Amino acid sequence: MTGTLERENWISGGKSLVLRKQHPGPLRPWRKRAAQLGGGCGWRTAVAPAKFCLWYVVPSWLWEPPGYLHSSLFLSILFQVTLLETALQSRPNLSLPLVRCGWACTQAMSTRSNCGSRSFLWAQTQADAASGLPRSRLGFLGLGGCGLIVKHGMTLRNWASFFVVFQAWSLMILQVLGDMLNIYYAYIQATLTLKVDVAPRLFFPEGGALKEHFSSMDSFQLREAGGTRIPRPALIYGRAVVTRTVTKAQSLKSALAWAALGCKHPVLSTLCEESQQGAWSEFRRF
């Protein structure tokens, strides 16, 4: 063994140590040929349609995307890009100009397939415009973003994979942003409900000799009611009525607390200015 290594080292001129390679085996030439072709043989061809289901169908089950993403034009183009990746992933030497040409053909085929239903597209466009959603053709703007990001020497397989993943993550990001906006609106609504409905019940416990009456017209009033309710309700925000019976010791404290809590919100700020002034006037009188 030592003599063999020394002889091979002498033949190579002392620059490298040449070791004998093992037999490649029956399957290794096929694997080498598949690697030279770009890996487009075998199970990779069947995986590409599964990519479409994994990156679009499954997220659409988990998170409902906006309405314009359900259009037939957008889905057909996205699916044809996946098929384009499947058909041409065995040719890794194609550059970006051919990719752009193939994308133009795909767009033309998708537009031609949908030209027969012009009335449906017009009705869908009108419905999207009425609901405030962007048109389905705005989905092509993602192509311009991909064209600016990808390099000139990028192969079609890498570009198509990048585009599919980019579109899938764009759908998910759009849906997450929509959920965040919905949560923010729900938070505002819950805050208004807390300040208008829950806070008066906390600061105005039932059972007492005094009643506090808030209104935008007659501001804040302390009346000796003796347990009877004020006949005319006070409207502050919608149908929210703040008329609660409190004890004499809690009247001023609850009034100032309600004024401070309500005036923090811009909607209620103009409505509780008079209440705050009335509370300070009653405080000076007290």
UniProtKB/Swiss-Prot annotation:
UniProt main location, coarse: membrane
Transmembrane segment boundaries: 68-88, 161-181
Cell compartments where the protein resides: Membrane
Disulphide-bonded residues: none
Topology versus the membrane: Multi-pass membrane protein
Keyword Transmembrane: yes
Keywords: Membrane, Transmembrane, Transmembrane helix
GO cellular component: membrane
Family per record: Belongs to the FAM87 family.
The protein's name in its UniProt record: Protein FAM87A
Lineage: Eukaryota, Metazoa, Chordata, Craniata, Vertebrata
Gene: FAM87A
